Regions:
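Conserved acetyl-CoA pyrophosphate-binding loop and the N-cap/start of the following alpha-helix
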Residues: 72, 76-84
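N-terminal first-folded block
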Residues: 19-36, 51
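A short, internal acetyl-CoA/4′-phosphopantetheine-binding micro-motif in the GNAT/acyltransferase core
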Residues: 66-73, 101
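Conserved GNAT acetyl-CoA-binding A-motif
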Residues: 89-102
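Conserved beta-strand in the GNAT
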Residues: 38, 45-55, 59-67
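Short amphipathic alpha-helix that is part of the acyltransferase structural core
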Residues: 1-26, 40
């Protein structure tokens, strides 16, 4: 798998992004100002996963969206994307946070990737 930073035509990945965030209006708010990473299959014919990371200022970056195409799920590609992003941003910021829903499965996934639960934003 190959991961690429996409800087133009980001909306073409909207269907994948909607898997992680059901509100297109919210996606629009962070997509253009964020870095969009796309993981492709080996032949670059199909996007496997997407992630958006935003600059929140003061050395903080936030993983706003992480989605894996349904037929690629539960094969380690989400974790591979998170590991790539952690490595990519380790010298860029001092903190990488995750903004996510409060489902047990999602929180557990990020904790298994090394993130620490800090608070409920509600």
């Amino acid at each position: 798998m190959q991961i690429r930073l996409v800087s133009t035509g980001k909306k073409r990945f909207l269907q994948l992004l909607l898997l992680a965030d059901e509100q297109e209006s919210m996606i629009d708010r962070y997509l253009e100002r964020g870095d969009l990473y796309v993981m492709y299959d080996k032949l670059f014919t199909e996007p496997v996963a997407v992630a958006v990371v935003t600059d929140e200022g003061k050395g903080i970056r936030e993983l706003k969206n992480l989605a894996v195409a349904p037929h690629w799920q539960r094969k380690g590609y989400g974790r591979q994307m998170v590991e790539y992003l952690c490595q990519r941003y380790q010298n860029v910021c001092h903190t990488l946070t995750v903004g996510t829903g409060d489902s047990h499965m999602t929180i557990s996934f990020y904790q298994n990737c090394g993130f620490v639960y800090s608070h409920n934003g509600a």
